[in-house]
Amino acid sequence: MVPSVFRFWGAQPGWDAAWPWLLGILVAAYLLGSIPFGLLVSKFMGLGDVRKIGSGNIGATNVLRTGSKKAALLTLLLDGGKGAVAVLVARYLYGDTAAQVAGLGAFLGHIFPLYLGFKGGKGVATFLGILLAIHPLTGLAACLTWLATALVFRISSLAALMAAISAPLWLWVFGLNTTTGLGLLLAALIWLRHSANIKRIVSGTEPKIGRS
């Protein structure tokens, strides 16, 4: 039987015989998601090891703290791209359920990367890439939520938290009920990964965008 969580995501009875394929998709997407583009970009551009800069995170916000907007933008696009590619390829080959499994795998790969001892990023860019691939309007709405929050408060982590928590709502608004479960799960993981940031936001000590 297909577990109830996947039935909620939209799996059909025919998938009962396809679990080896779903597991393979999950693993392949995880390995793709594990590629630490922030670290690779910063080293390739001669900016050093981004893990030794600022927050030590491998995401675009911390790459920006190297002073290179180009490196930060490239990291953002690549981290988002790996989530989108995983979803699009899986959907093309096996359909919507496989696409959601691939999105989960890519996200887990980014936050728990095999290549860095399972110490990765916070998953925001990858999450947005996954949303854009699953449903472009939902992804765009979440991106605009991030942008609006960032412009008003100038705090990247707060913008990420608002974008994450808005995603399941946008999925529901656009009628993607079978994908809302995935959105809730990934949003919850993003909030957990930002626990230290949340404490700093509450205390008023969270750095502004472009500052260390």
What are these regions (language model features)?
Residues 31-38, 103-114, 190-197:
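Transmembrane alpha-helical segments that form the membrane-embedded catalytic/substrate-channel core
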Residues 1-20:
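Short, strongly hydrophobic alpha-helical membrane anchors
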Residues 39-71, 195-212:
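Cytosolic, membrane-interface loops and tails of multi-pass inner-membrane proteins
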Residues 19, 23-27, 72-73, 99-104, ...:
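Hydrophobic alpha-helical transmembrane segments
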Residues 64-67, 90-94, 105, 109, ...:
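Interfacial segments of multi-pass membrane proteins
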Residues 48-60, 116-128, 155-163:
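Short, non-helical or kinked segments that cap or interrupt transmembrane helices
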Residues 65-91, 102:
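Multi-pass membrane catalytic core of lipid/isoprenoid biosynthesis enzymes
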Residues 20-46:
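N-terminal signal-anchor transmembrane alpha helix
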